[in-house]
Amino acid sequence: MSKKNSVAIMTTISAFLFCAVIVAASLSPLAGTGAAANQFNSAGMWSAVGMILVLYFIPFLVYMLGVDAMRYVMAVLCGFGLLIHLSSAGFILMFSFFSDHLLSEVIFVLGVSLAAAAVNVIWFVAAFRSGAEKTSVNTLT
């Protein structure tokens, strides 16, 4: 599979999981943590999902049109996403330990957040692996 296809697949999965974190958090007790928290199916939740999709789609579209340097812009955004998902996972753990809510009430959000962080790490591997690491079927060494 080509590097561009790998990046496209991982970017799509990453965008889906980022949106899933927002939706899952709005369905969990985390939705009641403050005035800025999104309730499920609210305008705030949909605007957050829309903003994430726009922030994924624009650099992805430019990259797919052939601007290979956009991979570095996407890497910075992926790094921000990794930071967001890992800090969200830490916040969710702290929330469950120091509130009246059990870990079982937020475990799905925690799992999706950690899965999104793992996908972002895999995205870096897919985007920046070297061509020398690929094994060829035709070599007889």
Curated annotation (Swiss-Prot):
The organism's place on the tree of life at top rank: Bacteria
One Pfam family cited in the UniProt record for this chain: DUF5391
Topology of the protein relative to the lipid bilayer: Multi-pass membrane protein
Subcellular location: Cell membrane
Keywords: Cell membrane, Membrane, Transmembrane, Transmembrane helix
TM helices/strands, residue ranges: 7-27, 47-67, 75-95, 106-126
Metal-binding among keywords: no
Repeat is among the record's keywords: no
Xref: InterPro entries: Uncharacterised_YxaJ
Annotated GO CC locations: plasma membrane
Protein's name according to its UniProt entry: Uncharacterized protein YxaJ
Organism: Bacillus subtilis (strain 168)
Gene: yxaJ
